[in-house]
Amino acid sequence: MVIQVYVEGGVINGNVDATTASNSEALREELNRFMQKALGREDVTIVVKKCAGYKNAVKEFINSEDIQSTYLYVDLDRVPELREDWFNSLVEDDISIPEDRKSRICFWIQEMEAWFLKQPQAIEDWASDEGYLRVAGQEAEIADHHSIAGKDIEHLQHKASDVLATILRQKFMLEPRNGKKLKLRYGKLRHAPGIIAHLSPAALIKRDSELERFCEKVKDQADDM
């Protein structure tokens, strides 16, 4: 069984430079690999389709012909209790999602980067493998950073991407060039693929109800075939 997942993120190949296009494809590939591992099923093939902005992803999802083989995975951009507000915001833009498709929509709450903050060791491992240098005085583990330690990641007051960017900027820097020390500045297309590659699907499922819901729904569908 083939499952197509329309996702927010990446760029549509066209008038973009080669590096951006390559990074965008790397993001799609890593999401594809991660979701496949999360499912743990050899009888299901995941095909992630990058759609740039979330509205474009929604439109592609709505216009897909085979309802049973398609899902949508996008940022909720708000706390989970305000899920209906996301649907209402689309109606305001004259985008209506058929009722029979709403159950096939899953969310990153509040953003995809929440996955990374829920599994800070993945960030540590990625930074180490990339050879980033630790800033002096910032030896404490990312898990103990005041912005996420002991907090519900899905209810952070600031965007997960901003929190991640702050953590990376405070804790890591690049190899000095021409005598200049450059702090690590987060870029989704540049850095997210590498962090995703270090995530543990089994561990993340236990901390992310939306990812768990996606996997269980696909598994149930496969079992019924």
Describe the role of every protein-language-model region.
Residues 2-16:
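Catalytic nucleophile-elbow at a beta strand-turn-alpha helix junction centered on a G-D-S/GDSL motif
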Residues 1-2, 17-48, 52-225:
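C-terminal accessory helical subdomains adjacent to catalytic cores in phosphodiester-
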